[in-house]
Amino acid sequence: MSKEIKFGNDSRSKMLNGVNILADAVKITLGPKGRNVVIDKSYGAPQITKDGVTVAKEIELEDKFENMGAQMVKDVASQTNDAAGDGTTTATVLAQAIIADGLKAVAAGMNPMDLKRGIDQTVKAAVAELKKLSTPCSDSKAITQVGTISANSDHEIGEIIARAMQKVGNQGVITVEEGQGLETELDVVEGMQFDRGYLSPYFMTNHESGTVELENPYILLVDKKIGNIRELLPTLEAVAKASKPLLIIAEDVEGEALATLVVNNMRGIVKVCAVKAPGFGDRRKAMLQDIATLTGGTVISEEIGLDMEKVQLEDLGQAKRIVINKDETTIIDGIGDESVINARVSQIKQQIEASTSDYDKEKLQERSAKLAGGVAVIKVGASTEVEMKEKKDRVDDALHATRAAVEEGVVAGGGVALVRVAAILKGLTGENEDQNVGIRVALRAMEAPLRQIVENCGEEASVVANNVRQGEGNYGYNATTGEYGDMLEMGIIDPTKVARSALQFAASVAALMITTECMITDRPVAASAAAPDMGGMGGMGGMM
């Protein structure tokens, strides 16, 4: 297929058009008074959102050169979202400002490579200054404020996220699901829970709730299928003598073994329940070891030379309480040694850092959280499906933002931190005048988020930006109330990681676009010419 090629200013102007179309659609969502964007869907109701990356992902332009520009800025939003979970609109606004000013400088004859060096130098210095301005975020009040700001000033969402983090710890697993009611609720699963239920309903102890409830049980962990009851007899006899219930977690319990357990349970000889081990393959082995660590037991495995017929009570795990329904098992207050549990958690965290797969990381984080203290589920409530999707997006954003805040601290929000950094770096110089122009381009762009927030409020951006510039420290503009003051005291804060990621990714892609000299795309295929009318046969008119 033949290609279409554009060079120099022709290519850059087309690219800038695409950048502007995408950025203009995204930036109207910025700030507490940002507007909604309605996205048509091929099925179901339209989607209403104020999430920058959601808007960016929907944009595809007909002109292929313009589309290349749009897709590169879309990449800025996606990378920022992946790294920090929020700040996608800020990143898009920064990228647009750097690209627009940078391309003007290129058109005026500046060296694109020197401009790039100037921009890179500024961003490196800005990141260092942001870290100096950052303050730690550990208390519930600060976490609530971050969540509220990221959820577009929804205080309820901020509070629920702070409560969830309080319950399961800052590194705990918090998942977001669609709820059934109108209210957003927090459901905390304490202890270790895994998605395997009882193997037979005859194990049930509470028929009203359909659950098996075991108080102070022993736990037998076996890394194989159990089909022969003879293997279990020594364990059953020892547990019966101790007058305690028994939970068996194995790859499977079937045939004669399962039938005998059911009969013993129904006759009251020994209170017992059997469930399948969670996971598959190597992950199952790892999760059995997690349960063993939590309950102070040993996994009975032929691989390490342990035989079921020689199991002692000391090999069994113990917990204060276990609740099992047809789908899930929850182990509460295992008696495992805390130092051993902490060592296991540290080991899993090292695996998370070494892992390159997002899926593996997610599963490892779940395991770590289950060992460390539980899982929180935020069930989002709404009156319509459209509102549900929009609210769930905001809760996801707020959750990522609060995690980022706990990780690297917070800075003054509302675009103020970047304005302060720009003021600190005013005297920064490069090796030549073209690099100095690149530095000025990046410093001017740092005001763009503040200006856009103000514009979305319907106020005059230049006046507000000037007033903020004249202030010091955390002094800024509260776009919700229209007042000036200390942003931290007013609860308007941004995670440092979000501000840093937005600036770094925006500058990285923008600098690449400024140094673009040629663009290549497939030539559009012309529509085939319409076939001519067929001539009529004798005595007939032409066919229509």
Curated annotation (Swiss-Prot):
Could you tell me which SUPFAM superfamilies the record lists for this protein? GroEL apical domain-like (SSF52029), GroEL equatorial domain-like (SSF48592), GroEL-intermediate domain like (SSF54849)
Subcellular localization(s) per the UniProt record:
Cytoplasm
Q: Which Pfam families match?
A: Cpn60_TCP1 (PF00118)
Reaction catalysis annotation: ATP + H2O + a folded polypeptide = ADP + phosphate + an unfolded polypeptide
Primary localization class, coarse = cytoplasm
The protein's UniProt keywords, in alphabetical order, are:
ATP-binding, Chaperone, Cytoplasm, Isomerase, Nucleotide-binding
> Which positions are annotated as binding ATP?
T29, L30, G31, P32, K50, D86, G87, T88, T89, T90, G414, D494
Q: Name one GO cellular component term.
A: cytoplasm
Q: A Gene Ontology biological process annotation?
A: protein refolding
Matching PANTHER family, A to Z?
Answer: 60 KDA HEAT SHOCK PROTEIN, MITOCHONDRIAL
What family is this?
Answer: Belongs to the chaperonin (HSP60) family.
> Assembly and interactions?
Forms a cylinder of 14 subunits composed of two heptameric rings stacked back-to-back. Interacts with the co-chaperonin GroES.
From the Swiss-Prot or TrEMBL record, give the protein name: Chaperonin GroEL 2
The record lists the organism as Psychromonas ingrahamii (strain DSM 17664 / CCUG 51855 / 37)
Name the encoding gene, please.
Answer: groEL2
